[in-house]
Amino acid sequence: MKIMVINGPNLNLLGIREKEIYGAKDFNQVIDYIKEEGKELGLEVNCFQSNIEGEIINFIHNAYFEKYDGIIINPGAYTHYSIAIYDALKGVEIPTVEVHLSNIHKREEFRHKSVTAPACIGQISGFGEYGYIMAMNALKNHIKSK
């Protein structure tokens, strides 16, 4: 089973940016953790990151053309306003789980709404990097049940 993990803007600053919210592990440590846990689950996991909306959309399109079974996406701030990412996710019809390291519903009001989550089978928010592992388990079970 092939899973694409897409991280959006500013996630490359993990371990630098607002450690009290996002944790002390740097981006590469989080990616290594995701890949290691994915391997344990018997998944082929490929991770991508971009601060550019169009590149994120290209990753989503590539997931379709490269025959990925599922997508895990942390759209970062694009969560709250990117209709283009929503459209890309709807367009490829690949089971997707949206992940957020922090609980977006406990933060500033503008972070409470996700325009991208309705294009996903579910959303996991507030469990730090473990949210990606939860998402991999959820995707694996969802795909197997089809």
UniProtKB/Swiss-Prot annotation:
Gene3D superfamilies noted in UniProt: Dehydroquinase, class II
Alphabetized InterPro entries for the sequence: DHquinase_II, DHquinase_II_CS, DHquinase_II_sf
Keywords, comma-separated and alphabetical: Amino-acid biosynthesis, Aromatic amino acid biosynthesis, Lyase
GO MF term list: 3-dehydroquinate dehydratase activity
Domain of life: Bacteria
Pathways per UniProt: Metabolic intermediate biosynthesis; chorismate biosynthesis; chorismate from D-erythrose 4-phosphate and phosphoenolpyruvate: step 3/7
UniProt binding sites for substrate: N74, H80, D87, L101, S102, R111
A biological process term (GO) from this entry: aromatic amino acid family biosynthetic process
A Pfam entry, by short name: DHquinase_II
Catalytic center residues: Y22 (proton acceptor), H100 (proton donor)
EC number: 4.2.1.10
Residues flagged as site, Transition state stabilizer: R17
Reactions performed catalytically: 3-dehydroquinate = 3-dehydroshikimate + H2O
Subunit structure: Homododecamer.
Alphabetical list of NCBIfam families matching this protein: aroQ (TIGR01088), PRK05395.1-2 (NF003805), PRK05395.1-3 (NF003806), PRK05395.1-4 (NF003807)
General function of this protein: Catalyzes a trans-dehydration via an enolate intermediate.
Family, per entry: Belongs to the type-II 3-dehydroquinase family.
Protein known as: 3-dehydroquinate dehydratase
Annotated organism of origin: Clostridium perfringens (strain 13 / Type A)
Species lineage: Bacteria, Bacillati, Bacillota, Clostridia, Eubacteriales
Gene: aroQ
